[in-house]
C-alpha cells in the first residue's frame, strides 16, 4: 500500500515484490504473479476462489501468497479446504512495506521464502519469524502479532 498525502488514504499501486527480491539479493527462481491488489477486508470468496484456482493450476508445488493481515487466516482456511498437495505460505505486513524501515514486510517475506522451502505440503501463515498451521493461528489485534491457538 502507498499513502496519498493529499487525501490521507492508503491505496494500492504496483507490487513491491520484484524490488524486494532484488534488495534481499534473493537467488531463488521466482515467478511473480499479481492476481489482485485488494484490501483483505474487502476480499470476497470469489477472490479467494481465484487464488485457489491459480494455486491449484500452478506448476510450482511451493507457493507464497502476500496478503493483508486482517483476513489471511480466512484465506488460509479456504485454501486448506481445497486439499492441494502443495506447500502454500501466506504472509504479509502489519505495516505496509512502502512505509520504509518501520515495516515488517521485508522480514516476513524473507521468512516466508525460507519456510516454504522446508515445510511439508499444507497451508501455513508466516509472520514475525514464525510459521503457523492454517488452523492453529490467529491475529491478536491487541498486540499486533500473530499467535498460536495452542
Residue ranges and their predicted role:
Residues 1-150:
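Active-site histidine-anchored catalytic micro-motif
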